[in-house]
Amino acid sequence: MADDKTFPSTTRQLAVSLPAERTNVCVGADTYSIVLEGTDTDDKFSFMDMLIPPGGGPMPHAHECEEMFYVVEGEVAVFCHDRRTLATTGSAVNIPGWAPHVFHNLSTVPARLFCVVAAAGLEREFLEIGPRVATRTTPPPPVSSEKKAEMKKKMPEIAKKYNARILPPDTFNHLMSTEELKLVAAADGE
């Protein structure tokens, strides 16, 4: 037990993340800025700044880690198990480990989320699958339909490496209107 003058020893140093030094990666239509990686936090958590365009959001999935996000701007519809929740500016959401989920920006303006994943690791999956871009607001580069199809085939294997699973694309369709499904398909380039 540490007293006022001694503390348990650590070799870890202060981690500082400057905007110009961050890695920014595109996952589908979204752009994620990796603010803190697992290497910064002894793999306890990672922190990302996510820009989700209208219709954007990930594929339905589940992963071992807890995922929390805070909606800084805009709104996203969150689907978890059989529940749909609208998370608006100022809302915080926690998704338990291994809970099937997805979120989509079903509005007409971009949404910005701060996302914490504990334990870290999910950011490494994003870095493996997505192209790097210059800034957190840089839109994804154009991707051919062949490259998109190739990546969708690879995703389940890549996800497994990071203790995650990709779910069927229509997992949460029963909770969305026809117009919302069209918006999501358009963001995905379909």
Model-flagged regions — what are they?
Residues 53-55, 89-90, 98, 108:
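Tight coil/turn sites that cap or link beta-strands
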Residues 82-100:
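Short acidic-glycine-tyrosine-enriched beta hairpin
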Residues 47-54, 62-80, 116-119:
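Short, conserved beta-strand element in jelly-roll/cupin
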Residues 1-44, 139-190:
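A short, N-terminal "cap"/entry segment at the start of jelly-roll beta-barrel domains
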Residues 31, 68, 75-77, 84, ...:
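Structural motif
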Residues 41, 97-124:
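Ligand-binding loop in jelly-roll beta-barrel domains
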Residues 124-145:
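A hydrophobic, small-residue-rich beta->alpha segment in the mid-to-C-terminal subdomain
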Residues 36-37, 57-63, 104-106:
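Short histidine-centered beta-strand/loop micro-motifs
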